[in-house]
Amino acid sequence: MKKLSSVLLALSLSALALTGCGSSTDTSADTSAEETTTAADAETEAAADEATADGDNVIKVGATSTPHGEILEFVKDKLAEQGYDLQITIYDDYVLPNKAVADGELDANYFQHTPYLNSFNASNGTDLVSVAKIHYEPFGLYGNGVTSVADVAEGASIVIPADDSNETRALLLLQQEGLIELPEDANANDGVTTLDIVDDHGYNITTVQADTVAAQFANSDAGSLAVINGNYALAAGLDISTALAVEDASGDAAQTYANIIAVRNGDENLPKIRALVSTLQSDDVKTYIEENYNGAVVAIF
């Protein structure tokens, strides 16, 4: 820091000398640019000092691969500039990342939404909390050989995910498109299941595990439909623009099912967690999401 102070002092004296000699506007602009750059360097150095003050500059985060792991990889260098070493562990299920955070193996995870986190806490006696919403992945209704909702044939088969929160989203999407009717008070927070369907309009609705919906759709008969979560659609190579319908971005599903950063209760204000959140909620990340996922992933901060 003494070195930094010396640099700033030298720059200040230089600027005064140039002003006394009647320096040009261009020279003043150059000096201002140098001062701005130096200030930015000082801010980065200060962040690095905070990160390493207690030796805790490693951020261990668990995530599913698409898009969570990819987004984390994007911010890895940005966190390094702040003095943090982001270490990413990729999981292919929705149980182990929460257990790893609860057990202290990870500092945070990024793969789930709040309803799932609440359900996991209740079932496992854990105390994990959300510290930030990052994005949501719109559910899409896809048709095999069907080009519009109006063309869905009577008695068509519709496959939807079976777990509670995903089943709710799928059913709300089907209702949004007029394919089924649910109770008037049906909403994302309270949840619904196929047992709550008031009128299925003759469609054959079946539930399967969320991670198998895309595969079943790929092997389905012509005229069949499926409601697929955004990340599974991405992994299966489906383009959200080909979906017959997607969740309304202004609906409560977008906020309710936003993907979050989860940590142990009490860790919310750790410097490294604050750094992780602020970096993930930056304009650079929003632009990255917009440019790489074609609407299948939507920033929500």
Q: For each predicted feature, which ranges?
A:
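Sec-dependent N-terminal signal peptides of Gram-positive bacterial secreted proteins and lipoproteins
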Residues: 1-26
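Bacterial lipoprotein signal-peptidase II cleavage site
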Residues: 17-45
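Short, well-ordered beta-strand elements
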Residues: 54-66, 84-90, 157-158
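Short helix-initiation/N-cap motifs at beta->coil->alpha
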Residues: 88-99, 187-215
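Ligand-binding "clamshell"
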Residues: 119-131, 146, 236-248
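A conserved helix-loop-strand patch within extracytoplasmic ligand-binding domains
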Residues: 131-180, 286
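A bilobed periplasmic-binding-protein/Venus flytrap-type ligand-binding module shared by bacterial periplasmic
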Residues: 138-150, 257-270
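Periplasmic-binding protein-like
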Residues: 168-175, 280-300
